[in-house]
Structures are given as structure tokens and as C-alpha cells.
Amino acid sequence: KSRSRGLGDVYKRQHLSVLIETMRREGYELAISKPKVIQKDINGVLHEPFEQIIIDVEEIHQGAVMEELGPRKAEIQNIESDNKGRVKLEFIAPSRGIIGFRSQFLTITSGTGIMTSVFDHYGSVKAGDIAKRSNGVMYSMIAGKTLSYALFNLQNRGKLFLGHGKEVYIGQIVGLHSRDNDLPVNPTKSKQLTNIRAAGTDENLILIPHIQHTLEQALEFIEEDELVEVTPDSIRMRKKGKVRT
């Protein structure tokens, strides 16, 4: 077990991912937990890092972005409109508050938003909990190979992270649950065959395109009880404490 340290969210997204990718290409296999901030004791008071966030979005997305950053302890510093339909927002927020926000930001703005952040200062730790991912995950409760029949039925319960014919193990995260709780599922379940074939019972199974996470996106997605597993051949996410077989 080892720890890698750096400064700011930029480190987490760039330096950490570069380090992991380098190790991956050299043949290493490793599991990475959710990034955490480094707090300091200054004159008997616990301090945490804060970052300056500059966001450029369409005006129609301004409210949703501000609503999402509120529970993350971000404080608005400035709002500036270009009078052409876009607005620039400036915030100061604790670094732990924006871990995992970038992927949500892209979803909120439909990929049209621009966000940059830079370390600003160390300040007193903000009281209260930081907002977490609002949805639970679907994770495999059995090892095997995924089948279209099982995935077709699971896609009604959330968004899938993999397609047909993929090897999975117990505890592997296979999708985002539509509700706030985690859901154990069987993505390897096959259709039971019978000797009777009725007209109209066989249908073509159409799977919704699944979400594929990059390393950076996976690191932002996971929560405290989850890990990103990296091998030379794959990037996967899993629940901690589940038996891997």
C-alpha cells in the first residue's frame, strides 16, 4: 500500500493519472481509492486547501451549476455576462468539494461548459459534510461473462458501464443505479429456453450504448467504499470488501 501526494485538483486529474498510466504501461496492476485532500494543523486550527474555480457556461445552465456547487461549500466571487448568452462564474471552494464535480459539470452543461481550477490558499476546514454522488451503483454479484439478455433487463434500472461478452467478477461495478442505493445484479443471466416457441415472443434485444470511463473519469466517479482497478488491459471500478473471484 502506498500514497501519492500533490497539490490541488489539477494534480489529481493530471499528475496522478499520468503516474498511473505510466505504471500501467509498464505492466503493473493496482487499485486506487478515492483521492483525499491533505489537511494541515496551523496554530492549533485544522486547515484544508481551497481552489479558485472559473466556469464559463451558457446562461441557461447557470442556475444548475450554482445549485450543484452550493452543497460542495463553494462561494461565489463574481458573475460576469458577455451579453451573448454565456456567463463567467468565479468561485472559491475547498478542494474536497470539487473532487468528482467535473464529470457532473459536463453532464449539467451537455458538454458545452468550460471549467478551470487552481490552488488558492489553505483555510479553516469548512463545517458540515460535502455533497456526494447522488446515485448508487449496480455491481455484479456473480463472476462470468455478460450477456445481452441480462444487460437488456438491467438497463431499465440505470446506465450501464459495459456491453455484451465482457468478463466480470464479484463486486465489479457494472452501472449507475437510477436510485440512491447500491444494487447487486447478475449481468451474466441467460434466457431460459423452452421447447415451446410462440409467435412474437422472440424480440431483438437493443442495448443502449454504455458509458465508458477514462481513468480520470473513473477516479472522479468513485466514492469512499469503491476502488478503481487498473491493469495493462483494462480500467474497472469495484466495491470495497466484495470477494473478487
Where are these regions (language model features)?
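Solvent-exposed beta-strand/loop surfaces of large extracellular or lumenal domains
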Residues: 35-36, 75-84, 191
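A common structural junction motif
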Residues: 23-31, 69-77, 106-114
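Helix N-cap motif at beta-to-alpha junctions
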Residues: 13-16, 58-62, 92-99
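Long insertion/accessory domains within large nucleic-acid-processing enzymes
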Residues: 21-23, 47, 92-96, 103-225, ...
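Single conserved hydrophobic/aromatic residue that forms the stacking wall/gate
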Residues: 1-11
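Short acidic loop-to-helix transition motifs that present clustered carboxylates
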Residues: 35-40, 84, 120-122, 213-214
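Phosphate/diphosphate-binding loops
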Residues: 56-70, 226
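Short glycine-/aliphatic-rich beta-strand segments at the starts of folded cytosolic domains
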Residues: 45-57
